[in-house]
A protein has these predicted regions:
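RNase H catalytic domain
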Residues: 15-20, 62-66, 80-160, 171-172
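Acidic/proline-rich low-complexity IDRs
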Residues: 6, 46-47, 135-137, 170
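Loop-to-helix element that buttresses phosphate recognition and phosphoryl-transfer chemistry
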Residues: 75, 79
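RNase H-like nuclease fold core
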Residues: 1-74, 85-86
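Acidic two-metal-ion nuclease catalytic site recognized across multiple nuclease folds
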Residues: 166-179
Length: 179
């Protein structure tokens, strides 16, 4: 990555049904990478990259990170895991802040909290967090959900569309609040 030594990555997860979840419950994750973000939610900064996908619960499938069920929590943890994997492929990044609306996922990922559920996925995400921390300064910050924060809303859009198995709207046609 050229020109960016400080990045903000917004992560989110989405789930079709968050009660009685199973391995077949649809869930999706998304993240967007922002350079020059002020953190105030007004959309400052440039979108450098974005990724999204479905939560993989089949332990034999490519992309499985340890999730056993599709849920909002496994989607949030998956978003962080994929963001960390992306960070590990980038050169020149000195500082990265992972911003998300799930305090649970941020604190599990960074090791502040111990996982009581989703242990396999939590262990994988914690391992990625530790590995990433060896290469750059990494921290997590909580942002309020569904409060019009542009980049958090974009991550929500990406996750929701992945869960629905639909393509996200291109940034130029998307507005905060659009799912």
């Amino acid at each position: 990555m050229q020109g960016s030594d400080k990045l903000h990555i917004y992560v989110d997860g989405s789930c079709s049904e968050n009660r009685n979840v199973t391995a077949t419950t649809k869930a999706g994750w998304g993240f967007c990478v922002i350079e020059g973000d002020s953190g105030t939610g007004n959309g400052k900064g440039n979108l450098l990259a974005e990724m999204h996908g479905e939560v993989v619960t089949d332990s034999e499938a490519v992309g499985h990170l340890g999730a056993e069920v599709g849920s909002n929590n496994t989607a949030e943890l998956s978003a962080i895991a994929h963001a960390l994997r992306w960070l590990l492929t980038q050169e020149g990044v000195v500082t990265a802040t992972i911003r998300g609306d799930s305090d649970y996922a941020l604190k599990i990922s960074s090791g502040i909290w111990k996982a009581k559920a989703n242990r396999g996925l939590a262990k994988r995400v914690q391992s990625l967090w530790h590995e990433t921390s060896l290469h750059l300064e990494l921290c997590g910050e909580h942002v309020a959900a569904h409060r019009g924060h542009r980049w958090n809303e974009r991550a929500d859009h990406l996750a929701f569309r992945a869960m629905q198995r639909e393509s996200p709207l291109p940034l130029q046609f998307w507005k905060p609040g659009m799912r």
